[in-house]
Regions:
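Glycine-rich phosphate-binding P-loop
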Residues: 12-29
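Short, well-ordered alpha-helices that flank and scaffold nucleotide-derived cofactor binding pockets
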Residues: 26, 30, 48, 52, ...
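ATP-dependent small-molecule kinase phosphotransfer cores
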Residues: 41-114, 121-124, 141-145, 161-178, ...
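Pre-Walker A (Motif I) flank of P-loop NTPase domains
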Residues: 5-11, 112-113
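Post-Walker A helix-loop "phosphate-sensing" segment adjacent to the P-loop in P-loop NTPases
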Residues: 29-39, 52-55
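NTP-dependent small-molecule kinase module
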Residues: 1-6, 79, 103, 148-154, ...
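Short, well-ordered beta-strand core segments
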Residues: 115, 131-135, 188-191
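Phosphate-binding loop of NTP-binding sites
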Residues: 32, 124, 128-130
Length: 219
């Protein structure tokens, strides 16, 4: 059901690494005609640009890069390399970097009234007034297997235990950082994606979305 007659509907999805937030967000966005943005990709893109250009002043550089960033540019590059993953965990803790990316996401939401944004702090910081909030959780082993399969496509040198360790560390950093930690919003609907296949996950999300649309718009 596309939301053609509806002027505004915004969904926020939060969750730890490889819990399925990106997959769920993309599929739901396609189904309902929403513009999709992955917060994680923004941080990965920032890491990619820093690794590639080695700027002296990282903050000013990132500010400049994100002034001209489009979704087309963001989705054009492979941002899921181990090097970018390691670097992303570090820059995600920097307050000024988070501020720049926060402003980018807020402006994105202002321009795109019908959108879905996924990340770690979307419901709590970026879109606290989103129409519907989801929080994904998943067993670490299941999440690590997903990430391992994803990374394996680009490199045969990837080891499962290393992926699992990196994911555990990243989740710990996300939960414990002072700036915008990963938290479940009080209004968020929790979905355990470790126990669901992709179609079941989308079905569960769709049920909640349809219910919310009916409450807000009466149809």
């Amino acid at each position: 059901m596309k939301l053609k007659k509806i002027n505004k509907f915004q969904i926020s999805i939060d969750g730890g690494g490889s819990t399925g937030t990106s997959t769920g967000g993309k599929l739901i966005s396609k189904k309902y005609g929403l513009t999709f943005l992955s917060s994680g990709l923004l941080y990965r893109y920032a890491s990619y640009q820093i690794i590639k250009n080695k700027p002296k002043n990282k903050i000013l550089f990132i500010k400049k890069v994100f002034k001209n960033l489009t979704l087309k540019k963001l989705n054009k590059i492979n941002l899921h390399t181990p090097e970018i993953s390691r670097h992303t965990a570090v820059i995600a803790k920097i307050g000024n970097v988070r501020k720049i990316l926060k402003n980018f996401q807020i402006n994105f939401a202002k321009k795109n009234k019908k959108c879905c944004i996924e990340g770690r702090d979307i419901s709590t910081v970026i879109l606290p007034k989103s129409d519907l909030k989801f929080f994904f959780k998943c067993d670490l082993d299941v999440a690590a297997r997903r990430r391992y399969r994803e990374l394996k496509r680009n490199s045969n040198q990837i080891k499962f235990l290393e992926v699992k360790k990196a994911l555990r560390i990243r989740n710990k950093l996300d939960i414990s950082r002072k700036n915008s930690p990963l938290l479940k919003h009080l209004d968020a609907i929790e979905i355990d994606t470790g126990k669901l296949g992709i179609s079941s996950m989308v079905k569960k999300m769709s049920k909640e979305i349809d219910k919310k649309i009916k409450i807000i718009y009466g149809s």
